[in-house]
């Protein structure tokens, strides 16, 4: 049976994580984070023209990274009120949101080079973006799940204790799908960037 787009995206995400070859002395980190979403764009029914507005974002990552170059992560982001524009008359009911979930591969500066300081890294991953919203009359109800990719850069270090540190992260999320003019595919494009600061916790 042919795989759906979402199934293929999920399998590709798992393959990216699996292809990140483990190295000796790897550490596992939990990273709860918070920050700001900015620079968004979408063809989904954005009735309040809010996609490009700044909004609060939060989430968490699980990162596996040793002293070498390669690592991998699972990343989850949550953006409440993604379709809410404070400068516009309310159209959507409270509670709209966008979430993203992805698996990714990290390329980090080796610990031997940074000497225990901030370790810069780059990350690329694939996964899914889900958008949910409904207008006050429930005429337009948004329920979209689309495959997407993430690219980003950041830096992290255990600066506070041997097991607690900080992570700075900037990444861009963009759907693979676009709008080709057919009715079935209209409203499936979404992109945004986010800057977050996270608490780095070695498990």
Enumerate the predicted regions with their spans:
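Transmembrane beta-barrel strands of outer-membrane/channel proteins
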Residues: 32-40, 74-78, 122-128, 155, ...
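Residues that define the transmembrane beta-barrel architecture of outer-membrane proteins
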Residues: 26, 52-58, 95-101, 118, ...
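Extracellular loop and loop/strand-boundary signature of outer-membrane beta-barrel proteins
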Residues: 44-50, 86-94, 134-142, 181-187
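Gram-negative (and chloroplast) outer-membrane scaffold detector with strong preference
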Residues: 61-136, 146, 160, 196-201
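A charged, solvent-exposed segment within the mature domains of Sec-exported extracytoplasmic proteins
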Residues: 131-177
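Predominantly the C-terminal beta-signal and adjacent terminal strand-loop region
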Residues: 81-85, 157-203
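Cleavable N-terminal export/targeting peptides
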Residues: 1-27
């Amino acid at each position: 049976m042919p795989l759906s787009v979402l199934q293929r995206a999920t399998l590709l995400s798992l393959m990216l994580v699996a292809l990140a070859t483990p190295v000796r002395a790897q550490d596992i980190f939990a990273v709860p984070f918070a920050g700001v979403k900015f620079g968004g764009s979408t063809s989904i029914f954005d009735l309040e023209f809010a996609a490009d507005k700044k909004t609060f974002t939060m989430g968490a990552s699980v990162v596996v990274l040793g002293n070498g170059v390669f690592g991998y992560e699972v990343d989850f982001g949550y953006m409440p009120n993604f379709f809410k524009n404070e400068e516009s008359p309310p159209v959507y009911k409270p509670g709209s949101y966008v979430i993203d979930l992805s698996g990714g591969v990290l390329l980090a500066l080796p610990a031997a080079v940074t000497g225990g300081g901030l370790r810069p890294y780059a990350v690329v991953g694939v996964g899914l973006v889900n958008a949910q919203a409904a207008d006050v009359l429930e005429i337009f109800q948004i329920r979209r799940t689309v495959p997407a990719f993430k690219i980003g850069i950041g830096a992290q270090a255990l600066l506070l204790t041997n097991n607690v540190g900080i992570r700075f992260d900037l990444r861009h999320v963009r759907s693979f799908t676009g709008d080709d003019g057919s009715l079935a595919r209209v409203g499936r494009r979404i992109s945004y960037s986010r800057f977050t600061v996270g608490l780095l916790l070695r498990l």
